[in-house]
């Protein structure tokens, strides 16, 4: 009986990419530990010493919801996702528009990115990223023969991207706009779009991004602060200068878990956008390197899964897996770049680690989709229909 139970357990584990699963488990675990460490001071100040675990418990609840939805998501075949993705995408865009409606949208730190449900705030842009990946993957898989045509293949998806981008910029959420644009462009490139059209659009987008920065006072202020945070360390460069101080204090091995000084009201958003800075201070270069390697490994696995799906003839699944990998990779890269002073502040969370209900829920659903693709790949290799 014990032998049979062990064999059954091995068969279950063989149905999943264990390297992907463990990289996700480790990142989620590190996130929980660091959120608790980074948020103790602010939780005590806001809610009292007896509620120091407030943000940890809240994030744990978000994670539990995300894992539950991920479990449900895993049961849905990819053919069903492809069949209904257009409707899901339209709903997510509608929610993105509702954010801008007075009385429905909820403003935080000068940006109207949330819909308040009293108990929680939902950030539709996080789910738009997921469904934009699926919509673009479905579009490219259906329109593969027309991708070299500007009017038939390229223009329709560009119009859709423009509508989503316009709504994101109205919030404003420049970081999400950049990520969504990068996702669509990457999926088009992987789908085999004409190189001439692709390069032309990259040029147009680069000019557009440059103009968007120049036309916005607050974006220009962020760029100026990024160029030299020490020129105004108590004003525009305050957040970045303290993030860099946190990295400097961490050195090789950090000051020890829980020993961060910057999280004590010096570094704003320590448990959200700038969690990596607290991690760098407490765990040092070694801790940051470990997190980066886990992200690299996770992204590599998504591409391996996507490549196998392509070999098995499922273009939609292949593009979804690789698109989600690019989403996580681009957003992680931007967040890390901001924390290290390599990129201007964008307001993006670190996937799987930072505090945030919508972010962690969308991440869990996205990773469940990848696990579903991997599971379907393995079933097809065994000659089974899915």
UniProtKB/Swiss-Prot annotation:
A Gene Ontology BP annotation from the UniProt entry: regulation of cell shape
GO molecular function (one): peptidoglycan glycosyltransferase activity
Substrates-to-products reaction catalysed: [GlcNAc-(1->4)-Mur2Ac(oyl-L-Ala-gamma-D-Glu-L-Lys-D-Ala-D-Ala)](n)-di-trans,octa-cis-undecaprenyl diphosphate + beta-D-GlcNAc-(1->4)-Mur2Ac(oyl-L-Ala-gamma-D-Glu-L-Lys-D-Ala-D-Ala)-di-trans,octa-cis-undecaprenyl diphosphate = [GlcNAc-(1->4)-Mur2Ac(oyl-L-Ala-gamma-D-Glu-L-Lys-D-Ala-D-Ala)](n+1)-di-trans,octa-cis-undecaprenyl diphosphate + di-trans,octa-cis-undecaprenyl diphosphate + H(+)
Pathway in which this enzyme or protein is active: Cell wall biogenesis; peptidoglycan biosynthesis
Membrane protein topology class: Multi-pass membrane protein
Location of the protein in the cell: Cell inner membrane
TM stretches of this protein: 20-40, 61-81, 85-105, 114-134, 150-170, 187-207, 279-299, 318-338, 350-370
Recorded family membership: Belongs to the SEDS family. FtsW subfamily.
Protein name: Probable peptidoglycan glycosyltransferase FtsW
Protein species of origin: Nitrosomonas sp. (strain Is79A3)
Lineage: Bacteria, Pseudomonadati, Pseudomonadota, Betaproteobacteria, Nitrosomonadales
